[in-house]
Amino acid sequence: MSTPNALAAFNSSPSLNAPEGITNPPIDDLLEQVSSKYALVIYSAKRARQINDYYAQLGEGLLEYVGPLVEPGPREKPLSIALREIHAGVLEHTEGE
């Protein structure tokens, strides 16, 4: 049961926030930091694993891994943090490692 008023209210409602994660930073900007999309996947996955291990070791009192080098958002996932670090250029990447 739709009415013209209901449709007008639906069309004028504010849109949802833009999605975060792999769309921010843009993939094209990230590819400028590495040689290929495959290198980007490996590079970001390794860094995300380090960030995840860092958070896991905090409770144990160990400091073997380096934490996030950019300010993480609330409940931001390690892969999103790693991609933002790559985009910001705070990591040095060498091919083959």
UniProtKB/Swiss-Prot annotation:
Identify a single GO molecular function assigned to this protein.
Answer: DNA-directed RNA polymerase activity
Listed Polar residues bias regions: 1-16
* SUPFAM superfamilies (alphabetical): RPB6/omega subunit-like
* One Gene Ontology biological process: DNA-templated transcription
- What Enzyme Commission number(s) apply to this enzyme? 2.7.7.6
The UniProt keywords, alphabetically, are: DNA-directed RNA polymerase, Nucleotidyltransferase, Transcription, Transferase
Give TM segment ranges: none
Transcription recorded as keyword = yes
Gene3D superfamilies xref list: 3.90.940.10
Region (Disordered), start-end ranges? 1-21
Q: Name one GO cellular component term.
A: DNA-directed RNA polymerase complex
What chemistry does it catalyse, as a reaction equation?
Answer: RNA(n) + a ribonucleoside 5'-triphosphate = RNA(n+1) + diphosphate
Q: Which InterPro entries match?
A: DNA-dir_RNA_pol_omega, Pol_omega/Rpo6/RPB6, RPB6/omega-like_sf
Its biological purpose is as follows: Promotes RNA polymerase assembly. Latches the N- and C-terminal regions of the beta' subunit thereby facilitating its interaction with the beta and alpha subunits.
Similarity comment: Belongs to the RNA polymerase subunit omega family.
- Assembly behavior: The RNAP catalytic core consists of 2 alpha, 1 beta, 1 beta' and 1 omega subunit. When a sigma factor is associated with the core the holoenzyme is formed, which can initiate transcription.
Q: Which PANTHER family match?
A: DNA-DIRECTED RNA POLYMERASE SUBUNIT OMEGA (PTHR34476:SF1)
This protein is called DNA-directed RNA polymerase subunit omega
Q: Which organism is it from?
A: Saccharopolyspora erythraea (strain ATCC 11635 / DSM 40517 / JCM 4748 / NBRC 13426 / NCIMB 8594 / NRRL 2338)
